[in-house]
UniProtKB/Swiss-Prot annotation:
Domain of life: Eukaryota
Topological type in the membrane: Multi-pass membrane protein
Pfam families the UniProt entry points to: 7tm_1 (PF00001)
Record's protein name: Adenosine receptor A1
InterPro entries from the UniProt entry: Adeno_A1_rcpt, Adenosn_rcpt, GPCR_Rhodpsn, GPCR_Rhodpsn_7TM
Glycosylation: residue positions: N159
Keywords tagged on the record: Cell membrane, Disulfide bond, G-protein coupled receptor, Glycoprotein, Lipoprotein, Membrane, Palmitate, Receptor, Transducer, Transmembrane, Transmembrane helix
Primary subcellular site in the record, as a coarse category: membrane
Ranges of the Extracellular topological domain: 1-10, 70-80, 147-176, 260-267
Length: 324
């Protein structure tokens, strides 16, 4: 049966579509920049591509599914569950990509001489594959049984088979709040965020120690190296900060829902928290453009070559740029 869309839902859909229209092209641009620019081919940028792929999927898949769920169509229980799980997969993928980036930056400043022999392209690819495998396992856990099926069945005719079980599809109807808080947040979101915080604190401490060493004629190169590392570390720490700022409010609301069932959370706060989580997928390309010179150079090359119909003869020399 067709369901009318309220004015509030129309506003929600409009904002979600706007986020998707910024997120998808922006992150495709990030992937494109890494593909065309040799200076963006090290391990860090491979992990950034993995993060960008997850963000593209948020705009192209999760946001449309979120709009459908917000309308609340009548669907079979597991069909609704399948629409709710992708956001869990992609959130975990983003967290693990950010963790891989943090570990990579730590190794760059901790063992700069041996870094390239330790962090090889093959090992980076294996790490990315492992991140995605873990993300699917964590995000699909509700499909394996940790969901609200038994709770919903308790309110219905027990003689009805699961395949005939039709519900109004909403995220909180099918996803267990115990799963969201105890497993998703307390195990797979909060600990990695705290670990990344400690890693970046150590990265900044190592860089500060190196930069505070007495500069001599023989130490110009190390000073320059660590100065560049400091700039990129600050930019990637900003990406982490924005991710935490975007996702923690929704997880805090989930904790309130679980631990204080009688507490009434205003719907507007829930929607703002959802907008923050989805909007985070559009933030990273903006950070890269303004904070990382390699990306800024690559973005300008793409713009000049493909959108301004200019043949930038100097692009080949810029491509070989190795500024870190």
């Amino acid at each position: 049966m067709a369901q009318s869309v309220t004015a509030f839902q129309a506003a929600y859909i409009s904002i979600e579509v706007l986020i998707a229209l910024v997120s998808v092209p922006g992150n495709i641009l990030v992937i494109w920049a890494v593909k065309m620019n040799q200076a963006l081919r090290d391990a860090t940028f491979c992990f950034i591509v993995s993060l960008a792929v997850a963000d593209v999927a948020v705009g192209a898949l999760v946001i449309p599914l979120a709009i459908i769920i917000n309308i609340g169509p009548q669907t079979e229980f597991y069909s609704c569950l399948m629409m709710a799980c992708p956001v869990l997969i992609l959130t975990e993928s983003s967290i693990l990509a950010l963790l891989a980036i943090a570990v990579d930056r730590y190794l760059r400043v901790k063992i700069p001489v041996r870094y390239k022999s330790v962090v090889t392209p093959r090992r980076a690819a294996v790490a990315i594959a492992c991140c995605w495998i873990v993300s699917f396992l964590v995000g699909l856990t509700p499909m394996f049984g940790w969901n609200n099926l038994n709770k919903v069945l308790g309110t219905r005719d027990l003689n009805v088979s699961h395949s005939e079980f039709v519900i109004k599809c909403q995220f909180e109807t099918v996803i267990s709040m115990e799963y969201m808080v105890y497993f998703n947040f307390f195990v797979w979101v909060l600990p990695p965020l705290l670990l990344m915080l400690l890693i970046y604190l150590e990265v900044f401490n190592l860089i500060r120690t190196q930069l505070n060493k007495k500069v001599s004629s023989s130490s110009n190169d190390p000073q320059k190296y660590y100065g560049k590392e400091l700039k990129i570390a600050k930019s990637l720490a900003l990406v982490l900060f924005l991710f935490a700022l975007s996702w923690l409010p929704l997880h805090i609301l989930n904790c309130i829902t679980l631990f204080c069932p009688s507490c009434k959370t205003p719907h507007i706060l829930t929607y703002i928290a959802i907008f923050l989580t989805h909007g985070n997928s559009a933030m990273n390309p903006i950070v890269y453009a303004f904070r990382i010179k390699k990306f800024r150079t690559a973005f300008l090359q793409i713009w000049n070559q493909y959108f301004c119909c200019k043949t930038n003869k100097s692009s080949s020399s810029s491509t070989a740029e190795t500024v870190n």
